[in-house]
């Protein structure tokens, strides 16, 4: 009797626990609530300059979309593009599988090290690292993908190297040049050459030097051309026509399945893309024997062409480079010189930029705004004693500079480090008012009455003056210009603040949330994340400002 009561009580307890778990336990809704929450980042010791920049760039949806574009085109888990994308998605709480609060950005540091950047364990500038990251990301995005040798298109026989012409090898059975060289004996290599690794492995560190624009140390690499590198695929030694060799008869004793040709000049070089030009006619029996091989080689070349084409890839079978998508921080400044005597205008010179650096006025003053600094940035400059090519007179010329192409994401750097007459460096802590909505129309080349966009890659170049638009020098963000020029209206995404002195301190980031929390603002300092008000954000002494022109704007093609 007692045992039955105990058993019944145990059953009721288990049922109550199960019911509580079903009604109040973890559910999909709670997982969805965790999605989109901002995560902190581990500090490895003086790496706040990296954490603050990752938090700021994680608040830029268009930059993340650009990373996704190239990561989908050529995924490589050890590349900087993939490492950055994974880190930013984990920070935003949007990664499909990874979670972490705080999360370790060690993969980004390892990717930078693999690209040749050595970051000593000391304090660094976040603005310098910003340019380092963009430079490395752009190099990864536009560099040609490592392709195999033309011999990869040859059918192979796993048993021996004889009678390749009569073996029906599948088109998809490609082998790389390096793997073929490693599997053959020394007597089977062309000219008894030693085994050579692939070009991706032959990277020699020649010397160590410092880039003039940054204090971060970079190792300069030298890539050697090997037989499987794109630079040496189409031309080996003088008149050696490797492509025509592929289309000739294969002798049983030939290393790598290549025939030994005594007179390469007698052979015709095939056209890229799987086509070949006319060549001397072979004997009828040999022509029939090689007819099947030629068809397989041609189809293999076309298959390789399809495999190696795509966004961010360069195919050795095509003489046209695919269009590359520039990162969203890339813009262009336009400079033009006007003769004050005859009024002739020079051709517009365009210079690309990833960020703009605004200098503080020599004397500290109150009421300083971002509009004042932008106005000073594009102020015209008088050049004296310049000879005009039009009137041949030596007169004063006026040089004007404006934003010719506005980027999708705008990074503004407020330079706060100055040198004193004594030779010491100090940091200025002036407060610069910056708006949540910024219109760049007063500082750009804007001529609404012109419908023609011809003349330059950035539009018409009749003049670089922004018509008669007033400068946005007030404390407002120029909301009135936003209705006139909506494409030039930017919204604030993140603010990087440096606390401390010129030689030491700490970086923190104020940033927008992700997904449904994009209207909220968060304070991030390494592993610390807390929600703040927009008033607190607009009251901090900004060092780096991140703006964008809207989440749905299409990426610009170069």
Swiss-Prot record:
Question: Which reactions are catalysed by this chain?
Answer: Thiol-dependent hydrolysis of ester, thioester, amide, peptide and isopeptide bonds formed by the C-terminal Gly of ubiquitin (a 76-residue protein attached to proteins as an intracellular targeting signal)
Biased composition range(s): Low complexity: 280-289
GO BP annotations, alphabetical order: negative regulation of mitophagy; protein K11-linked deubiquitination; protein K6-linked deubiquitination; proteolysis; regulation of protein stability
Q: Where are the transmembrane segments?
A: 6-26
Where is each USP domain found? 39-550
Its biological purpose is as follows: Deubiquitinating enzyme that acts as a key inhibitor of mitophagy by counteracting the action of parkin (park).
- Name of the protein this chain belongs to: Ubiquitin carboxyl-terminal hydrolase 30 homolog
């Amino acid at each position: 009797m007692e045992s039955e009561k105990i058993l019944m009580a145990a059953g009721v307890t288990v049922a109550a626990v199960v019911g509580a778990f079903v009604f109040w336990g973890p559910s999909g809704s709670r997982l969805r609530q965790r999605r989109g929450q901002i995560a902190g980042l581990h500090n490895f010791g003086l790496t706040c300059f990296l954490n603050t920049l990752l938090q700021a760039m994680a608040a830029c949806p268009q930059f993340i979309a650009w990373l996704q574009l190239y990561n989908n085109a050529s995924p490589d888990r050890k590349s900087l593009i993939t490492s950055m994308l994974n880190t930013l998605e984990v920070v935003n709480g949007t990664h499909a599988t990874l979670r972490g609060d705080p999360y370790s950005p060690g993969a980004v540091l390892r990717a930078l090290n693999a690209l040749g950047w050595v970051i000593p364990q000391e304090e660094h500038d976040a603005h310098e690292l910003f340019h380092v990251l963009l430079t490395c990301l752009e190099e990864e995005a536009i560099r040609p993908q490592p392709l195999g040798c033309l011999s990869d298109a040859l059918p192979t026989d796993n048993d021996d190297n004889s009678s390749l012409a009569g073996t029906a090898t599948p088109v998809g059975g490609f082998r790389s040049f390096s793997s073929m060289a490693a599997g053959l004996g020394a007597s089977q290599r062309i000219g008894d050459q030693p085994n050579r690794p692939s070009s991706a492995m032959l990277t020699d560190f020649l010397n160590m030097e410092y880039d003039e624009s940054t204090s971060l140390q970079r190792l300069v690499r030298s890539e050697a051309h090997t037989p499987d590198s794109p630079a040496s695929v189409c031309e080996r030694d003088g008149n050696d026509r490797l492509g025509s060799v592929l289309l000739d008869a294969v002798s049983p004793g030939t290393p790598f399945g290549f025939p030994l040709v005594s007179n390469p000049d007698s052979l015709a070089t095939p056209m890229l893309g799987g086509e070949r030009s006319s060549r001397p006619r072979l004997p009828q029996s040999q022509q029939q024997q090689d007819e099947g091989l030629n068809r397989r080689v041609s189809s293999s070349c076309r298959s390789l062409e399809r495999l190696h084409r795509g966004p961010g890839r360069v195919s050795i079978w095509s003489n046209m480079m695919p269009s590359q998508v520039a990162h969203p921080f890339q813009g262009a400044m336009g400079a033009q010189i006007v003769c004050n005597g005859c009024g002739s205008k020079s051709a517009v010179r365009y210079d690309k930029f990833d960020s703009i650096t605004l200098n503080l006025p020599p004397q500290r003053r109150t009421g300083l705004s971002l509009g004042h600094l932008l106005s000073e940035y594009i102020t015209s400059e008088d050049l004296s004693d310049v000879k005009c090519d039009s009137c041949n007179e030596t007169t004063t010329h006026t040089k004007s500079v404006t934003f010719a192409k506005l980027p999708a994401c705008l990074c503004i750097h407020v330079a706060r480090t100055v040198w004193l007459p004594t030779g010491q460096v100090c940091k200025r802590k002036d407060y610069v008012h910056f708006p949540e909505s910024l219109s760049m129309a007063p500082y750009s080349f804007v001529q609404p009455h012109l419908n023609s966009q011809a003349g330059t890659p950035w539009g018409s170049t009749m003049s670089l003056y922004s018509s008669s638009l007033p400068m946005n020098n007030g404390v407002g963000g120029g909301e009135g210009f936003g209705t006139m020029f909506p494409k030039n209206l930017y919204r604030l995404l993140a603010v990087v603040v440096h606390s401390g002195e010129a030689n030491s301190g700490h970086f923190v980031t104020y940033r927008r949330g992700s997904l449904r929390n994009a209207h909220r603002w968060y304070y991030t300092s390494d592993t610390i994340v807390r929600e703040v008000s927009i008033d607190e954000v607009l009251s901090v002494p900004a060092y780096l400002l991140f703006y964008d022109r809207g989440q749905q704007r299409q990426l610009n093609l170069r």
